[in-house]
């Protein structure tokens, strides 16, 4: 199990107890600094004070459990307009929206695709309408995905 998935399982109960959805979390390096980025949301959106409240709750859990070796910075925020997509339910929620995905392994010589989410089946296969074709990808083959903000309507 990846460290991000372990962290997700560890902090989800604390986030949900406050009435928020834990959209996802990512652990990465920015220069010499390790960052734990946590995305939370609720219907109607989430504000700065709520992010601070969630941050304090997550910090308390992480201080007790100590799952990350060494120093790191905790960042808690809303997922934003170009929100990350992690689960089949995230894709289902945003059917009809544009997304960009990066695959773990290349397909037809490329790893990155942009298209409209048109379906997610029961086997968790995501279907994207690309410019000139349909792309069907099992969720497990997607390394990273985000919505694309559409300001043109």
UniProtKB/Swiss-Prot annotation:
Q: Which residues form a coiled coil?
A: none
Q: Tell me, what is an example of a GO biological process annotation in this record?
A: translation
> Which InterPro entries does its entry note?
Ribosome_maturation_RimP, RimP_C, RimP_C_sf, RimP_N, RimP_N_sf
Instruction: Kindly provide the name given to this protein in its UniProt entry.
Output: Ribosome maturation factor RimP
Q: Which Gene3D superfamilies is this protein grouped with?
A: Ribosome maturation factor RimP, C-terminal domain, RimP-like superfamily, N-terminal
Family, according to the entry, reads as follows:
Belongs to the RimP family.
Offer one Pfam family short name for this entry: RimP_N
The protein's UniProt keywords, in alphabetical order, are: Cytoplasm, Ribosome biogenesis
> Where would you say this protein principally sits, based on its record?
cytoplasm
Which GO terms of the cellular component aspect does the record hold?
cytosol
Q: Where in the cell is it found?
A: Cytoplasm
Tagged with keyword Cytoplasm = yes
State the organism of origin: Coxiella burnetii (strain Dugway 5J108-111)
**The protein's role, per its UniProt record:** Required for maturation of 30S ribosomal subunits.
Which SUPFAM superfamilies does the record associate with it? YhbC-like, C-terminal domain, YhbC-like, N-terminal domain
